[in-house]
Amino acid sequence: LWLFAEALDATGDRFAMHGFSSRRRDPVRVHTLKSFDERYGGHVRGRIAAIKPGYYTRMGAALRHGSNMLSAQPAGRRLLLLLTDGKPNDLDQYEGRYGIEDTRQAVLEARRLGLQPFCVTIDRKGNDYLPHLFGNNGYVVIKNPAELPKRLPMLYAQLTA
């Protein structure tokens, strides 16, 4: 994530980075790593270095939160990039079909706002459910997490070309 942030900063593009986790519907925790208005520097690097995995993946809520922030930005192309390790899930019956359909609805809502949602996952089973959520060209499965530092900047360049 740190290397990707460095690469994003080098492009000169405005960007924000957030992490999220959940334990039931309330609250979905959103951790600001870098806001759009914040300059990339030591404080941001420290937040990125300190992030740890936690709890569950209530993807629909995270996408809606990101969509609200991103839709307020004046940029012509607005990429909503989701980096995840698995499919939508949470404790309160957000498993299976409900989590999948809520996430799919959040993706459709993002597109209606003029955003470009795209998912990057390290979940080897991602091809089983991500086409339904993001469409055939709206995601990529990176099976080896060690490839993320190399692949994310290249993917960003392709998505924003």
Where are the model-predicted features located?
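Acidic, glycine-rich A-domain
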Residues: 2-161
